[in-house]
Every structure is written in C-alpha cells, then in structure tokens.
Swiss-Prot record:
Lineage: Bacteria, Pseudomonadati, Pseudomonadota, Betaproteobacteria, Neisseriales
Protein name in the entry: Large ribosomal subunit protein bL17
UniProt entry keywords in alphabetical sequence: Ribonucleoprotein, Ribosomal protein
InterPro entries: Ribosomal_bL17, Ribosomal_bL17_CS, Ribosomal_bL17_sf
Name of encoding gene: rplQ
Molecular function, one GO term: structural constituent of ribosome
Length: 122
C-alpha cells in the first residue's frame, strides 16, 4: 500500500530524483527564476520553501542543515545573507509557480518558478 506517500516519482529513481531536485533548488536560489515542467515545479516548491525558512534563522546548525541539503557553499551564503533577511516578514509562500505554456518538442506543460519578493530590475 502506498498510503501517505505524497511526493511525485517523476519517472526517476529516488537518488536521481533527489539529485535533480537539489540541482533545481540550487538553480532557483541562485538565479531566482527558472523554467521547468509543471510537475517538477510543484515538487521543487516542496524542497525550496523549507530551505528559505532555514535561512531566516542564521545559526550554525541551520547553516549546516542547509549545506547538507544543497551541497553548495555559494547557495548557503546567499540563502543566509540575502534571501533569509528578505523573507523575514513572510510566513511561507516564498515560491511562485506560474503556468508557462507548452514545450515545443513533446507538448509538456511548462512552468515559470520564481521567488516572490524579487528585487526591482535594474
């Protein structure tokens, strides 16, 4: 029985899925906006939201937890130096998923994933 198993498999092994979501989370936190397929975007939201919540409380333990989940020092620095303070007033809902049409090759539904409080474009 698969009761209470709420994540999407995305047609990948568990290690491949974890690595893919880690890479996508790192890309989103670095660039603050990415385009991917809709099911991946919805699953990515479940990975990134807790990371930003970790970044709101700058402690050594939280930095180590964030590094364990991202494996990227630059992302951890940005998470605790820029993104955490930016989202202190917001209690969740840091990621926006917008439908973005369909991919040309296989007509897969695409989504634009972005952080909600982006700085103004220069």
């Amino acid at each position: 029985m698969r009761h209470r198993n709420g994540n999407r498999k995305l047609n990948r092994t568990s290690s491949h899925r974890a690595a893919m979501l880690r890479n996508m989370a790192n890309s989103l936190l670095t660039h603050e906006t990415i385009v991917t397929t809709l099911p991946k975007a919805k699953e990515l939201r479940r990975v990134v939201e807790p990371l930003i919540t970790l970044g709101k409380k700058p402690s050594l333990a939280n930095r180590r937890l964030a590094f364990d989940r991202t494996r990227d020092r630059d992302v951890v620095v940005k998470l605790f130096g820029d993104l955490g303070p930016r989202f202190t007033a917001r209690n969740g809902g840091y990621v926006r998923v917008l439908k973005y049409g369909f991919r040309k090759g296989d007509n897969a539904p695409l989504a634009l994933v972005e952080l909600v409080d982006k700085p103004a474009a220069e």
